[in-house]
Amino acid sequence: EHLRQMPEDYLMTASSEEVALHIRLIRSFKDKLFILHHQFHEEGNYHNLTLCCPIGSEAFKKLVGTITAKSLNILGAQIYLKKDGIIIVSLQVEASTKADAEDLEIWKDIKNSLSQLFEGEINLQKILKSRIRYAGAQKKMAMVPRVHVERTAGNPFTVIRVEARDHIGM
């Protein structure tokens, strides 16, 4: 049943372990506002965060904003919209001195911030204003961000490519 509810490209992009995790998260979701799962991948030196919640709750925006507020580097993201109204957002976050393998406190703090966001106790702007900004070396050439949307008649999928200078939160 789970696979029938997912988009066509789901099995091409999600591993069997991820599919099993998504099924477990959805089963435990029930009457909660969201479910957040954290896992550290030692072989790639990154953290994987998976958020499961109802569509329309601005899940991607809230998760990315919360991670950005902690000045963590997002390496990749996957978003899956189920036909039954559930969204699954997975982010790969670089392990660093701010978020090493043993530091579970930062992930508890992120979960608490998400709880406050989903319950409406705080807004994302307030969380982002509290973040520490790190000044880097000035770039010599400005780069104009571009978004390319590619949709071809023979391909049922839309490819969105973003070109921009990389920085925390991008």
Where do the language-model regions lie?
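Regulatory modules associated with amino-acid/nitrogen control
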Residues: E1-M170
